[in-house]
Structure formats: structure tokens, C-alpha cells
């Protein structure tokens, strides 16, 4: 899986879900096309950011806090942005070992893997990428007139920013 494929996949998954919800709310409200397009862009960017956050939390979150077992994506052989970043940075031997274990669904020592990913900057790069998507979502709102609704949408982006910062 390449990063390009990863981004396409999460845009078609979570990004599209958020985008549809946001754009449909604008369409139902009989807003101009520019507004519904801005809402689509907002939802797509926010949903993509949220999926990256979810992928990061799957590695570094607290099971009590997130209510699910950590490392489930890795157990299923799913490559997420933090792991793709790590594979990019790994030397050929590390890359071979990690890839083989993921493909064969062999257990990985999650704390050690996360430590390596943090040391190599893979986690912070994934968080930074998600933060950029959040910023893009916030920028999409600039096309909307100021209102309580627009401010509520903007506040959602700040909430996601806080979630991301909590992963650092």
C-alpha cells in the first residue's frame, strides 16, 4: 500500500462519510452551490483528519480512554499512516522484518513498535498531516458567512486539533 493509496482509501471511507453529511445538510437547507461545495470540502478534510487520528490512537491511545483494544489495525494487517511513515524511514532489513510480520499477521510488540515510530518521527508526521487536514477544513469555512453554525463547525476543528495534540 502506498501513501497515495492510503489517502484515497481513507478519503473514500471516513472522508466521504463526513463530506456527505456536511454537504447534505447544506443542500437540505437550500444553500447556494458554493456553500454546499464548501461544506463538502470541510467534511472531506475533517473526516480524513479524523481517520488519521483514529489510526494514531490505535497505536498510542489508552484502551480505557478509547474503549477498544490497541493495535487492531496491525493485527488485521492494515497499513496506516504512522506505519507507512515508519516503513519509509526504516532501513531495508527493518522494512523487510516489519512488512513480513504485518503481512503474515504475526504479533508485534506494540510498545516497542510505537517507541521506534516515535523515535523515527513517524507518529509526529502522521499527527502533523492530520493537523494540516484540519487546517484545510477550517479554511473551507472561510467561504461561509459568519454565523453560530459556522462558528460551531469551526469549534469542531479546534476540538480535533486538541485530540491530535493529546497524541503527541
Positions of PLM-derived features:
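All-alpha prenyltransferase/terpene-synthase fold signal
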Residues: 1-168
Amino acid at each position: 500500500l502506498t501513501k497515495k493509496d492510503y489517502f484515497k482509501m481513507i478519503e473514500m471511507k471516513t472522508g466521504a462519510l463526513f463530506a456527505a453529511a456536511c454537504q447534505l445538510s447544506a443542500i437540505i437547507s437550500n444553500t447556494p452551490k458554493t456553500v454546499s461545495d464548501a461544506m463538502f470540502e470541510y467534511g472531506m478534510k475533517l473526516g480524513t483528519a479524523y481517520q488519521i487520528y483514529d489510526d494514531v490512537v490505535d497505536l498510542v491511545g489508552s484502551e480505557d480512554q478509547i474503549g477498544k483494544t490497541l493495535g487492531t489495525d496491525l493485527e488485521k494487517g492494515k497499513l496506516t499512516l504512522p506505519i507507512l511513515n515508519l516503513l519509509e524511514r526504516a532501513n531495508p532489513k527493518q522494512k523487510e522484518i516489519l512488512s513480513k510480520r504485518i503481512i503474515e499477521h504475526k504479533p508485534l510488540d506494540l510498545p516497542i513498535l510505537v517507541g521506534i515510530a516515535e523515535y523515527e518521527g513517524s507518529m509526529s508526521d502522521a499527527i502533523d498531516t492530520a493537523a494540516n487536514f484540519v487546517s484545510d477544513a477550517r479554511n473551507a469555512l472561510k467561504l461561509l458567512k459568519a454565523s453560530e453554525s459556522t462558528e460551531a463547525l469551526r469549534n469542531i476543528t479546534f476540538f480535533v486539533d486538541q485530540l491530535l495534540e493529546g497524541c503527541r
